Amino acid sequence: MLSLKKYLTEGLLQFTILLSLIGVRVDVDTYLTSQLPPLREIILGPSSAYTQTQFHNLRNTLDGYGIHPKSIDLDNYFTARRLLNQVRALDRFQVPTTEVNAWLVHRDPEGSVSGSQPSSGLALESSSGLQDVTGPDNGVRESETEQGFSEDLEDLGAVAPPVSGDLTKEDIDLGAGREIFDYSHRQKEQDVDKELRDGAEQEDTWPGEGAEALARNLLVDGETGESFPAQVPGGEDQTALSLEECLRLLEATCPFGENAEFPADISSITEAVPSESEPPGLQNNLLSPLLTGTESPFDLEQQWQDLMSIMEMQAMEVNTSTSEVLYNAPPGDPLSTNYSLAPNTPINQNVSLHQASLGGCSQDFSLFSPEVESLPVASSSTLLPLVPSNSTSLNSTFGSTNLAGLFFPPQLNGTANDTAGPELPDPLGGLLDEAMLDEISLMDLAIEEGFNPVQASQLEEEFDSDSGLSLDSSHSPSSLSSSEGSSSSSSSSSSSSSSSASSSASSSFSEEGAVGYSSDSETLDLEEAEGAVGYQPEYSKFCRMSYQDPSQLSCLPYLEHVGHNHTYNMAPSALDSADLPPPSTLKKGSKEKQADFLDKQMSRDEHRARAMKIPFTNDKIINLPVEEFNELLSKYQLSEAQLSLIRDIRRRGKNKMAAQNCRKRKLDTILNLERDVEDLQRDKARLLREKVEFLRSLRQMKQKVQSLYQEVFGRLRDENGRPYSPSQYALQYAGDGSVLLIPRTLADQQARRQERKPKDRRK
């Protein structure tokens, strides 16, 4: 019988000899060090901390333990297992290991060797390597495409670099990748990926490098490091690839991608107006990159030729097909004559950045051209992106954000293109003359401020910078006073609804100075209202005439009376004098109020003293000392009733003062007691803190004494050198500091005597 150790040892030796014969350097320490944990895990099995398998059994199979390692029948077991595996593999095609590795690297063009025939053990161990080349259920897939490319694939496989010397073909069976053996292989893989990315960029920029990109289209095996051709994708992948490349090329070269205002997509263009001059095959070729076909070519060069033909057809057909599709103008169309829309005008003609940033505004056409207004909406919307941009187009002229282009030529506005050809005639050139600008300014002023046409004509006669727009302006007879302005604005707003609506709309955002004018008529009205005061106005109104709501005038104090009596403006001093009563009435009213207040504050004794006509006040009666009070009484001739009232007032006053003093003393006493209580509480808290500290220090002292007592008692020895028992003896402290050793019974008696002495003293 062959022992297990000898069997395993011979197997390892044979494996090592086999590796050395192949030419691989075998260093067991390198494989078992901690620097390569994947190899260590592959050889020794997974760690026991992460798995429940029997990691000590090096002959562990998929079925677990078949027999005990020290069993006698171990040799028979291995023989039976080997024979059983041979019987099971009779219907399978057995391929040696070397042949399998060669089959992985070099692909058989005739497909005679299938991927579904290796044994079960080999399939389990080398599954990671097989998945990179063929799928688990591929088998032998012979199609017309693979047969057509078999010779090219053989040539590409022959050019593969040689296998590295550090890599053995048995490592593939272990499931270890090449990066485990060679750490520099990762850097090589990064370099290969970088080269592939650079080749893809060059492929996008220049079509002629398709063949070189095809030559670089190789896959590197993750375990062996050898290069083999990539699997040819199916029809769906190729279609997706061509679609992505076509879209990228269309974005880079086709003018439709750059025009943001293109009115319709490609499908709507082809369905709306098909071109009669083009054959149907040409239309299909134009949209071939965007449609998924059933069959797609595999040649990259043919794809690039198709894309180049698409680009050439687009460049030829832009000037003919797109203009006819978007707008087919009849010969006498006013739009083609007025706006110079030639049929051969390209879409991407010189477009400035300023014009491209403006949005379309087709609603402004009706203000200037009745022909454009009569067109349907669909035709005008499709016309907008095709307006020639080297002239002053409607989008840049009447856009909602371009006010400078309305009054300045394109050369001053900076939106014209210098490289453009001769400019086309501007359809709006004769509309913006000087007279029209003046009329527009006056019309805006009349609409915004609520003027009637008569007042607008009067303002037109004296149209200068100082005609009434400044605060202290020259007094012209044509300017309006405050009353005239208010009446005229109200009449104009009630007479025409359009002017009132425009004035209310424009007054919310216009900020163009005052509208009320300080004129001669205002000065005359103020002089008539003031009389001899001679008030000269030094201010001007800052209220707009379009604000007709009286609630909006409440912020100005000198305009509050306008909504009540409808009189002329008056000076603030005149308003104050008109509102206030005469001075005499003010004085009388103040005295009466003061007297009523004093009457309410007076007591009953004061009322009686005033009724009895006593010549001195109650304060003197109450507060004067006795001698001064008697002298005061001797100075006046008083009746008995007056004297009795004075004595009663003095007595009640003295009693009141005494009661007040008593209450004051009581309050002072209460306050003093409160202070004393607070002081006692503070003292109590302080004493409690001191008591706690004393108890803590006393406890510490007792602990120290107890520890010292135990230490001293533990060191005491009798004549024989034995320690004294603490249950029989105790230490006694004398007054002079000496310590005595006495029996425990005597010590207990002395302790009881000391306890009785305090009790006798209490009695």
Curated annotation (Swiss-Prot):
It holds the Pfam family bZIP_Maf. A motif (Nuclear localization signal) lies at residues 752-759. It comes from the Eukaryota. A motif (Destruction motif) lies at residues 466-470. The record marks W103, L104 as: Cleavage. The chain crosses the membrane at residues 7-24. Residues 589-604 have a biased composition (Basic and acidic residues). Residues 180-188 are annotated as: Cholesterol recognition/amino acid consensus (CRAC) region. The keyword Nucleotidyltransferase does not apply. Glycans are attached at N338, N350, N413. GO terms for molecular function: DNA-binding transcription factor activity, RNA polymerase II-specific; lipid binding; RNA polymerase II cis-regulatory region sequence-specific DNA binding. The modification Phosphoserine is found at S519, S590. Keywords: Activator, Cholesterol metabolism, DNA-binding, Endoplasmic reticulum, Glycoprotein, Lipid metabolism, Lipid-binding, Membrane, Nucleus, Phosphoprotein, Repressor, Signal-anchor, Steroid metabolism, Sterol metabolism, Transcription, Transcription regulation, Transmembrane, Transmembrane helix, Ubl conjugation. Residues 369-373 are annotated as: CPD. Residues 647-666 are annotated as: Basic motif. Residues 108-150, 460-523, 585-604 are annotated as: Disordered. Gene3D superfamilies: Transcription factor, Skn-1-like, DNA-binding domain (1.10.880.10). Residues 116-131, 466-514 have a biased composition (Low complexity). GO terms for cellular component: endoplasmic reticulum membrane; nucleus. PANTHER family: ENDOPLASMIC RETICULUM MEMBRANE SENSOR NFE2L1, NUCLEAR FACTOR ERYTHROID 2-RELATED FACTOR. Interacts with KEAP1. Belongs to the bZIP family. CNC subfamily. This is Endoplasmic reticulum membrane sensor NFE2L1. It comes from Bos taurus.
